[in-house]
Swiss-Prot record:
Family: Belongs to the bacterial ribosomal protein bL27 family.
Keyword Oxidoreductase: no
Domain of life: Bacteria
Species classification: Bacteria, Bacillati, Actinomycetota, Actinomycetes, Mycobacteriales
NCBIfam families with a match to the protein in the record: L27
Pfam families reported for this sequence: Ribosomal_L27 (PF01016)
UniProt-listed SUPFAM superfamilies: Ribosomal L27 protein-like
Keyword Repressor assigned: no
GO molecular function, one term: structural constituent of ribosome
Biased composition range(s): Polar residues: 1-13
Full protein name: Large ribosomal subunit protein bL27
GO CC field: cytosolic large ribosomal subunit
Amino acid sequence: MATKKGASSSSNGRDSEAKRLGVKRFGGQQVKAGEILIRQRGTKFHPGVNVGRGGDDTLFALKAGAVQFSTKRNRRLVNIVEDEAVEA
């Protein structure tokens, strides 16, 4: 049995880099179209009105307005409520 490790062996792997996941815009905050609302793995939050979902499950605003969180059928939804003043 060898008392030394092989030439190409390593002393354990290293920890991975943090992915900066989480809610980026909170309820009541004003956002512009295209702004990222939530970065997530899987659909912890689901897209609601005026919210899109990217390939990596990132939720983003499709229109400008205020962020609103709600629940429907045990799903947490993220909606964008448009301002009437902005449209006029």
